[in-house]
């Protein structure tokens, strides 16, 4: 994968307009890889280009970096919602994008599918070691966007549940999730082999959506797999269990940087990462989905709350 990215980097490639986007789709074989905005490339040689995935939560993160940089005196251009990893990674590798919010575990698996690390710090260091030439990662945040095991707050208090291993004292214990979860490494077999926790399994085919949450709250199942940044986790009724043994691949928020980013800009970005905790990302996502706030408003509000530079 590193040689694939180097291929684009060595040609100093820039994508402009729909023709370039179609070329990327043809080269990497991505079905339906269109995006809501066309990537136009850098229009000012001095500007820092901040990009984002075609994913609302990622756009909020990108806007947060962009505003912090602008408030610190940098000229910033935004290229948001430009597609998924197969589309935007060549653009980052080419130098067309300077700052891009990513996720450690997912990006490590993309760059090195054979990687075996699962715990947060190990994943981060492994990722740093396989970044393509000309690219680096800034500091990782505590905030993550990854699979997580969740119980109701009431059940957590009743059984004193703080981490996954504590589930061994719960009986009966039924796990609910998409049918493929039953055979995932971190599914029932992983729970038993790593933590000694035996579970039944009930398929719920909504990818951790409202049906899954309802089944948990109604005690049809006692354990579910939700993304750790899901805004439903802000309702105070659910609890994410810690995973000290690294059963689930850690995937913390981490900015990918081009070599154009100077040390002062890196420091600005690292200050954002230092303040960005798990609850922060959940709350940002809640403001987007529940209050219909714009990414710009969410970023500005959060930066102000943390005492960081903002617009």
Question: At which residue positions do the language-model features occur?
Answer:
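An extracytoplasmic/periplasmic, membrane-proximal ligand-sensing/linker region
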Residues: 57, 184-187, 194, 267-311
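Paired acidic/hydrophobic, glycine-rich loop segments that form the ligand-binding mouth/hinge
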Residues: 98-102, 221-227
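Bacterial signal peptide processing site
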Residues: 34-37
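Bacterial N-terminal signal peptides that target proteins for export
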Residues: 2-21
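C-terminal motif of bacterial Sec signal peptides marking the signal peptidase cleavage site
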Residues: 27-32
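Ligand-binding "clamshell"
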Residues: 111-138, 220-223, 232-245
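Bilobed "Venus flytrap"/periplasmic-binding protein-like clamshell domains
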Residues: 47-77, 82, 142-212, 293-297
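A bilobed periplasmic-binding-protein/Venus flytrap-type ligand-binding module shared by bacterial periplasmic
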Residues: 147-157, 250-263
